[in-house]
Design a protein with these regions (language model features):
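C-terminal structured domain segments
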Residues: 261-310
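All-alpha helical catalytic cores of prenyl diphosphate-utilizing isoprenoid enzymes
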Residues: 23, 27-69, 80-87, 93, ...
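Generic, well-ordered alpha-helical scaffold segments in large soluble proteins
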Residues: 68, 99, 103, 238, ...
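Extreme N-terminal leader/anchor segments
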Residues: 1-15
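Structured alpha-helical bundle/scaffold domains in large eukaryotic membrane-trafficking regulators
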Residues: 105-109, 244-247, 251, 286-294
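Peripheral, non-catalytic segments of secretory and membrane proteins
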Residues: 9, 20-22
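Aspartate-rich (DDxxD/NDxxD/DxxxD) Mg2+/diphosphate-binding motifs
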Residues: 71-77, 90-129, 249-252, 256
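Active-site/pore-lining binding-face segments in mid-to-C-terminal subdomains
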Residues: 219-279
Length: 311
């Protein structure tokens, strides 16, 4: 896979990982402060599945990926900063949920569907009541989601575009529900795909509450592209995990494709998808106020999975 993507000019040498850790350190400290001192309970529960260095990298990637995903949008500086902070927050939330599942924690002991509904009420009294009912690790995770929901409401165009706020809530709820299904039920390719797609789309959707320029067709085109990126990143992640997943007998979407197709067919299929999304990115992106070149983030993120020593 790496050789084919390199041959097509889709893998580039960048110093993305260095930047990820630089921005991730400050984002991680900010997010820890939101949890009110309960974050240590999360790390204790996760054990080796989530270290502080992991969390810094995850927060940094969340910020950088949000910047990449909203690159086609014209977002003023102050609102852009909020969207990037939301990206760091949500990426850490999603990864923490996944890592705690990997550590053997029941999903409802991490964050229940009731907790999702409580956070989305965006009511400080509800927040305080819920936080009194749960142990420290769950309280920390709840506070991150509640802070995300409140910050979404503070974006400049939320009141005028309530349907987009609802799309964000629905995107998260579906991702959370499918994540629970993957724990409680036999592995489902559909549920696996939805969690991959939504984990990326939810980083970029807030940009549409921050940009003054909105059009329904552009909005849908952007969603379609983000969903494509989410599914591609899921496939690249599974490509990197092929050997480990085979050893542990874990489910893997790429291995599922390899069961009925040759290596060459699967590689070319994924490479074609990568090339198409890269082309669509260059066609959509007209703004130059990103912290990093969007093309470098796209390529560097893929590279970070396929050459894990970078991380």
């Amino acid at each position: 896979m790496y050789r084919e993507l390199t041959r097509r000019g889709l893998i580039r040498d960048t110093d993305l990982i260095e930047t990820v850790f630089t921005v991730g350190e400050s984002e991680y400290q900010r997010l820890k402060s939101i949890t009110g001192g309960d974050w240590e309970a999360v790390l204790t529960t996760a054990g080796s599945a989530l270290t502080e260095r992991d969390a810094q990298r995850i927060a940094g990637f969340g910020r950088i990926l949000a910047d990449f995903l909203i690159s086609p949008l014209d977002v003023p500086d102050e609102a852009r900063e909020t969207v990037l902070e939301l990206g760091a927050m949500m990426n850490l939330w999603v990864a923490t949920f996944d890592r705690l599942l990997d550590a053997g924690t029941n999903p409802d002991d991490i964050h229940s569907s009731y907790g999702v509904r409580a956070a989305f009420m965006r009511n400080s009294a509800v927040d305080r009541a819920y936080e009194r009912l749960v142990p420290p690790a769950r309280r920390a995770i709840y506070r991150l989601l509640s802070a995300h929901a409140h910050a979404i409401d503070d974006l400049p165009h939320t009141d005028a575009r309530r349907h987009i706020r609802q799309d964000i809530d629905d995107c998260f709820s579906e991702m959370h529900q499918k994540g629970r299904e993957l724990w409680y039920k036999p592995w489902s390719a559909e549920a696996d795909k939805i969690t991959s797609i939504n984990a990326i789309a939810i980083l970029g959707l807030p940009g549409w509450l921050a940009t003054p320029n909105y059009g329904q067709s552009r909005y849908q085109d952007h969603i379609d592209w983000m969903e494509g990126v989410g599914w591609l990143f899921g496939l690249i992640d599974d490509t990197a995990d092929l050997s480990e997943d085979a050893t542990t007998e874990s489910n893997n979407a790429v291995q599922t494709q390899l069961a009925t197709n040759s290596d060459r067919v699967v590689i070319e299929r994924i490479a074609d998808k990568t090339e198409r999304l890269f082309t669509e990115l260059t066609e959509m992106t007209t703004h130059t106020d990103c912290e990093l070149r969007p093309e470098d983030v796209f390529s560097g993120t893929i590279n970070s999975w396929l050459t894990p020593d970078m991380a």
